[in-house]
């Protein structure tokens, strides 16, 4: 019989909060509001805690657990994965972080030309005992146009791509597409992969008529999220890749601050 080195006793008396596998690329299926499901490729991190008297964890068991559940990734399945990790690895805590690209088919505003746009999403969950802490993050590319630049210039205004990330905790199922719509409706204009000339004209003029600082976008997203009853807690981050500055502009808030108003 082969020696099990991981199961050797360790006498250094040091508890490890997280041990496991990182940056595992893996095919998964996620829920899609329009098409029911969507196939994508995720990057996963999976961890458990390690008692002070255990020398190592069993890395292969993380993959074995994932193999049982990879066909569909949703909050219910993630809870089952975490419970299985704790059981097979004899742990009190388990953590999973899943980041993946999510694609939507978008129509250009004038010509209706269709193209796919990529969004970045992630699930982060930790089970400590029987308590589950679960959050979802949705990041969307957006377009911002500077209100100050528009106000002080005789013509034109500096504008650029930006990104907005919403991290939230919810008591019910929330579609990724719902969060994307909230973000895009709060920007100067949305981003498109394919635009013909008539579309470019529309998007350019729409952004000019709807100037936004990153602060404006963050606040407008927060106001829309506040009306979304399914969401219990949220964090909004907006970063603009400034076209005329050597730095990015950034704004951040959480629902904790909003509740104090």
Curated annotation (Swiss-Prot):
Question: Which gene specifies this protein's sequence?
Answer: folE2
* Organism expressing this protein natively: Fervidobacterium nodosum (strain ATCC 35602 / DSM 5306 / Rt17-B1)
The protein's superkingdom reads: Bacteria
**Does the UniProt entry include the keyword Hydrolase?**
yes
The name on file for this protein is: GTP cyclohydrolase FolE2
Named from the GO MF annotations, one term is: GTP cyclohydrolase I activity
Keyword Hydrolase in the entry? The reply is: yes
Site (May be catalytically important) at: 146
Q: Which family does it belong to?
A: Belongs to the GTP cyclohydrolase IV family.
The taxonomic lineage of its organism, from the top, reads: Bacteria, Thermotogati, Thermotogota, Thermotogae, Thermotogales
Q: Name one GO biological process term.
A: tetrahydrofolate biosynthetic process
According to its UniProt record, which reaction does this protein catalyse? Answer: GTP + H2O = 7,8-dihydroneopterin 3'-triphosphate + formate + H(+)
């Amino acid at each position: 019989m082969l020696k099990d080195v991981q199961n050797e006793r360790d006498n250094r008396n040091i508890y490890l909060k997280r041990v496991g596998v990182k940056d595992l690329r893996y095919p998964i299926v996620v829920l899609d509001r329009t098409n029911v499901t969507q196939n994508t490729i995720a990057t996963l991190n999976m961890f458990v805690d390690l008692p002070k008297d255990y020398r190592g964890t069993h890395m292969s068991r993380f993959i074995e657990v994932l193999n049982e559940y990879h066909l569909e990734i949703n909050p219910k399945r993630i809870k089952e994965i975490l419970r299985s990790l704790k059981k097979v690895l004899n742990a009190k805590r388990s953590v999973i972080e899943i980041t993946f690209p999510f694609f939507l088919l978008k129509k250009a505003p004038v010509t209706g030309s269709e193209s796919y746009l990529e969004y970045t999403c992630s699930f982060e969950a930790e089970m400590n005992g029987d308590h589950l802490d679960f959050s979802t993050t949705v990041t969307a590319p957006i377009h911002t146009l500077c209100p100050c630049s528009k106000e002080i210039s005789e013509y034109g205004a500096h504008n650029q791509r930006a990104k907005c990330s919403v991290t939230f905790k919810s008591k019910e199922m929330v579609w990724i597409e719902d969060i994307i719509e909230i973000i895009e409706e709060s920007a100067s204009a949305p981003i498109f992969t394919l635009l013909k000339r008539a579309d470019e004209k529309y998007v350019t003029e729409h952004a000019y008529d709807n100037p936004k600082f990153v602060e404006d976008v963050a606040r407008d997203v927060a106001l829309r999220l506040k009306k979304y009853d399914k969401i219990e807690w949220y964090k909004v981050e907006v970063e603009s890749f400034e076209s005329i500055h050597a730095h990015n502009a950034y704004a951040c808030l959480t629902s904790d601050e909003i509740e104090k108003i």
